A protein has these predicted regions:
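Active-site helix of classical SDR
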Residues: 123, 159, 167
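Alpha-helical segment proximal to the catalytic Tyr-Lys
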Residues: 128, 172-176
């Protein structure tokens, strides 16, 4: 039996990239998944894209991860449909690159709202439900850019570094409370996902790969 068989997961940014890959993997091992994403059109294609799985094994939720009320609704929908919450993968994110002088304050706030505030909200509202389920695992997708800075990624660097330390704080909180809930951040290097599309569009795919390397 898989470690995740019968478990229930919420995945943000699940319509594409790492979020979608995680959803497929968890479902292949018997988990039930709530697929959250802001892109309704792509979510609507999930029954076809996931046709090899039992259609009762997943559900979708159109979700602005920066909206607190939407998080409350997502948590309630997941518990109502699947009965519990065991896993949260905070995968939603954006990358709007610019140096510290060129970055507009509205852009700075937007990047932090999507990349960092959403992780705070997800953890805040998932932990009480996970503690009721007996155990849980939270995986927050940070980035190598949360460890190694770039001169032209000020907002992205700081938002992803924030995810790293927030995850540590959440893990310590759960340990202090005696909850059997793990919280970890992961820090991928460059992965060919839609978050890199602006870079590829700006420089062309080959030059973008060369710059990122």
């Amino acid at each position: 039996m898989s470690r995740v068989e019968g478990k229930v997961a919420i995945i943000t940014g699940a319509a594409s990239g790492l979020g979608y890959a995680a959803a497929e993997k968890l479902m292949s091992e018997g988990a039930k998944v709530m697929l959250s994403d802001i892109n309704k059109d792509v979510l609507d294609t999930m029954p076809e894209r996931l046709k090899d799985f039992n259609q009762t094994q997943f559900s979708t939720f159109v979700h602005d991860v920066t909206n607190e009320e939407a998080w409350i609704e997502l948590i309630e929908k997941t518990e109502n449909e699947f009965g519990k919450i065991n896993i949260l993968i905070n995968s939603a994110g954006i990358s709007l690159g610019a140096d510290i002088v060129s970055t507009e304050f509205d852009v700075w706030k937007k990047v932090h709202q999507v990349n960092l505030d959403s992780v705070f909200l997800g953890c805040k509202y998932a932990i009480p439900k996970m503690s009721k389920s007996g155990q849980g695992s939270i995986i927050n997708i940070s980035s190598i850019s949360g460890i190694v800075a770039g001169w032209n990624t000020a907002a992205y660097n700081s938002s992803k570094a924030g995810v790293r330390l927030l995850s540590k704080s959440v893990a310590l909180y759960c340990a202090k409370k005696g909850y059997d809930i793990r919280c970890n951040s992961v820090h991928p290097a460059f992965v060919n996902t839609p978050i890199l599309d602006p870079i590829k569009q700006a420089f062309g795919a080959e030059e973008a790969v060369a710059k990122l390397a």
